[in-house]
């Protein structure tokens, strides 16, 4: 990729999608800090420039190509092998991770699916109370019994879950007024049969492999193609080379029976398969939860 091509890509992304600028520093000296506008992303291919970007607290993506094999490019968690890796979502993720902003996963007509922040603690505790007899509908584990314990759990979850695994449980928000409606997202799924699972009151459903084809929109670039040394940790291989996840949701009572789940689950599944690279997505539902079973079978 030469500088002209890089600048064309930058202009396209900046004008159509972003409120920040992408700066390409390919095989050249690092410019003066004053040359960078606010909200910059840096793409470079030299170790020394990666270190300078870090020194100035700028989010940086490494670019590996045939002419820089001697560079380690280990100074950043972000790496691409070609310009196809520069998808809008990926660039937005780099920006949000660096500046510790909640990442918007997807939107629908009525809902925004976005990473949680500590501002949602009161609503998450309300959801916990409404589901005190239904642990699968809770965000916090059952051993979080005090406000302080719940607050600490949420802080640690936000700090570690999204950045390390690349996915997690997200908040569902109203598009018009940002009202918190509930939670939905992914958790690791262990496909292990034990006496407990055989006697469980829950049923497991494998989400249709073709469900994502029902969702319009351009296919996103799989992040595993442009992740760095964390790739093997983010994308472990399960038995039979499957990368599985469990999807779940829980909606506050006042927003139930309004089609929220049926609206947010298809685009969320599409995101899981097309961007996160899940080969199998399952959900666990109580046997007497007829509405959720019917939704899972759609």
Question: What are these language model-derived features?
Answer:
Residues 1-106:
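Asp-based, Mg2+/Mn2+-dependent phosphohydrolase catalytic module
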Residues 3, 17, 81-254, 270-271, ...:
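GNAT-family acyltransferases
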Residues 37-39, 167, 278:
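Short, high-confidence coil segments that cap the C-terminus of an alpha-helix
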Residues 249, 257-271, 290-297:
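Conserved acetyl-CoA-binding loop-helix of GNAT-fold acetyltransferases
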Residues 29-32, 268, 272:
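Short hydrophobic clusters on alpha-helical segments that form packing/core surfaces
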Residues 64-68, 191, 284:
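Conserved catalytic-core motifs of GNAT/GCN5-like acyltransferases
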Residues 275-284:
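Conserved GNAT acetyl-CoA-binding A-motif
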């Amino acid at each position: 990729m030469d500088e002209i091509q890089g600048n064309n890509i930058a202009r396209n992304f900046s004008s159509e999608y972003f409120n920040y600028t992408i700066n390409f520093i390919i095989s050249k000296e690092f410019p003066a800090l004053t040359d960078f506008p606010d909200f910059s992303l840096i793409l470079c291919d030299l170790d020394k420039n990666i270190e300078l970007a870090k020194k100035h607290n700028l989010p940086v993506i490494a670019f590996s190509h045939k002419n820089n094999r001697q560079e380690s490019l280990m100074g950043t968690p972000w790496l691409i092998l070609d310009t196809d890796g520069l998808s809008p979502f990926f660039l937005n993720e780099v920006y949000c991770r660096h500046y510790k902003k909640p990442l918007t996963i997807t939107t629908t007509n009525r809902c925004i699916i976005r990473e949680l922040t500590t501002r949602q603690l009161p609503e998450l505790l309300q959801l916990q109370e409404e589901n005190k007899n239904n642990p699968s509908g809770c965000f916090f584990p059952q051993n979080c019994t005090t406000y302080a314990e719940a607050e600490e759990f949420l802080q640690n979850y936000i700090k570690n879950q999204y950045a390390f695994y690349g996915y997690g449980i997200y908040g569902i928000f109203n598009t018009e007024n940002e009202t918190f409606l509930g939670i939905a997202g992914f958790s690791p799924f262990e496909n292990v049969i034990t006496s407990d699972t055989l006697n469980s009151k829950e049923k497991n459903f494998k989400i249709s492999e073709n469900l994502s084809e029902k969702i319009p929109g351009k296919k996103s670039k799989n992040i595993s193609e442009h992740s760095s040394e964390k790739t093997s940790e983010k994308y472990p291989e399960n038995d039979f080379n499957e990368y599985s996840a469990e999807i779940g949701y829980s909606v506050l009572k006042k927003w139930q029976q309004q089609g929220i789940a049926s609206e947010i689950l298809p685009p969320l599944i599409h995101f899981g398969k097309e961007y996160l690279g899940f080969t199998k997505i399952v959900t666990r539902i109580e046997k007497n939860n007829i509405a959720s079973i019917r939704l899972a079978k759609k």
